[in-house]
Amino acid sequence: VNKKLLLSLILVANGTTAQESASNRSPNGEIEHIEIKQFRQPYRGNVPLVQTPQAVDTISSEQLESESITRFMEALELTPSVVRQNNSGGMFDSFAIRGFSGDENNPSGYLVNGFNSRGYNGNRSTANIESIEVMKGPGSALYGQGEPGGTINIITKKPQFEEQGYIQATFGNYSKKQFEFDYTNSASKETAYRLNGAYEDSDTHRNHVSINSLHLSPSILWNISDDTSLSYEMEVLDQKKPLDRGVYILNNNFDDVNTDAFYGDIRDGAHQVEALGHQLVLNHKVSDDWHILTGFAYRDSSFEGVSSDTELSDGRQLIYTDASLLSRQRRARDYQALDVSARIELSGEIELGSVKHNILVGVDHYNFDIDTDYKVWRTAWGSGDTTYSINPNNPDYTQTQPEPVLKTLTEENQKGLGIYAQNLIELTEKSKVLVGVRVDKFEQDILNLRSDEAQSQEQTEFTPRLGFIYNANDKVNLYTSYAEGFRPNPGLDSNRNAFEPEETKSFEIGAKWQGVADRFSGSIALFDAQKTNMLTAEPDIGLSATLGEVESQGIEFQLTTELTDETVLALAYAYTDAKTANDVINADWGVPIPKGSRLINVADHIGHVSLKHYTTLLGKESYLGATVNYVGDRLGETTDANFILPSYTLVNLSASVELNDKVSVKLDINNLFDKTYFENSYHKLWTMPGSPTTYSASVKYQF
């Protein structure tokens, strides 16, 4: 086994990015792939990420394997400045980057192979992920609308022409049962195919909360000629799990909380998230210096179910005066989304005099439909009505369930057309200037089917990007950049009016280094960003409200080093000071939110330490690993500055042994010291506790 190769891959992945990966296997059988020579990532051109004036973290499949990560949201915790946000009862992946999140009532947005994954994604598996790129700061000047704190792009596993694959089974406490598989081979000299997926059927530490999910991803590659390739990928998701709002916290007492308690109703059953996606991409090499990349994506998704949720309105909630009565709402959701997008771009290089220009120009378009059917039942305000209340210490699931009544029934359509251009100008061998611009025409139409009223808006957004990068030597790059971004806000406010788009401005300065002294890779960045028209939740009515202008400043640091030829240490730290920049009155609650208020679920301090050691035990190639994750305290409710989620530190251990060339066994223990902690919050009565100690064993067979 080539330990040195694996250590090098980990160093590269933690530092910035690898443009190509080697055709070898890691100690745990991870398949490492060779990219097709003419294949280029969209919105990238011929400029590797390491040469861009931007903080970028790349999480490789090798890291996912060594950390035993099987969910996308867990992978994002490997990078600083990414924190969990309210995730709609555990149904979606939701995060903030550099303190900025999108709409709390919708899943966070990210790209898959450069296509926006709009709609409903559930809790994404990592089974088909080759790498995850976390590009900090607004990316609208290139990628179009996206999350304001940064752009996340998932690169999926591609078909290979050499037969390889694996199957893996994982079992653990809380009846965890998880299976993964991956197989790729050639069908002819010109075509190759791949099929991978994951299935899980597990309980959780939360009473009556289980997860059943299936992810499948078949793909085909056709090398039409030496210069042209056509690829097709499909993604299938079917996820079923109860919507779980977590626990309630009274008087900021986090000590006397039953973190296993479920306050919904077991008769509601599971919410279901379904998605079917298609991607078709044509790569053509026009000449040695120029490429054309064009693609089409179609994605149909839905989110349906009924839940019984703890009532949040003080005037309807009885738990504050009677510890035996927890008031509840009953909600029904039927959300449908359809996204169709296409793009075409030309990239290449030219020399004008002694100056080299790396040029990228393109056009993209999308059409996004989202239909919302939302029903709710709740007691009258101030009535003291005990209907559908439960005793939280002895819940009764035999009482009559009220029927939710229609609250929101809308049909929304968003259309966007973008034209973008970028030029990386190589002024000298060491100095480069990046200039980029994008123009977007955005249209939004919302039809309220209850009142037959329509809301429409049309805007044209101009988003520039400017950066400078200096190659101090072949190992170290220094950079500075300024970028602007925008993101359309979906839905209506409490007055049934459409929202203005979010707009972001960001400045950063930093350094990246790779392979210094053949052992050190990493980065450091200082950033300052502002955002307007940010949305926050109005939890009382399940809609959103404009928080106004917010700002975020901070520093990020990452370092990966080989302590020895067999041992790798990785350190990551982020300080984020994210707060409101103006005084605001919450429209629904009538609560003032003063300037300088913290942003919900954003920690000032985040730290991550990982130690990996490769060795031989009883003549078998083995791996030992330990990680320590620290998350600082966070605001738990936008309208209550005194509700603060405590900080926490978690320790995880892992070990694996290769029994032979084909079979390996892996053991994992997460939250080793069984710490009680809280991952995120929407409100003091909707606070999500983290998992206690979990352990699992995996057996992997590769072929």
Write out the residue ranges for each language-model feature.
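Acidic, small-polar-rich N-terminal luminal/periplasmic segments of exported/outer-membrane proteins
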Residues: 27-162, 485, 509
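Outer-membrane beta-barrel translocator/receptor signature
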Residues: 106, 127-130, 141-218, 224-228, ...
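Acidic/polar loop-and-plug regions of large Gram-negative outer-membrane beta-barrel proteins
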Residues: 200, 204, 216-285, 300-337, ...
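Structural signature of Gram-negative outer-membrane beta-barrels, strongest in the C-terminal barrel
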Residues: 223-225, 337, 356-368, 410-531, ...
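Face-selective signature of the C-terminal outer-membrane beta-barrel domain
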Residues: 278-300, 328-447
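Membrane-embedded beta-barrel scaffold of Gram-negative outer-membrane proteins
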Residues: 283-297, 301-307, 477-479, 501-584, ...
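Gram-negative outer-membrane beta-barrel transporters
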Residues: 428-430, 528, 546-638, 673-674, ...
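C-terminal beta-signal and adjacent terminal beta-strands/loops
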Residues: 569, 617, 629-637, 656-703
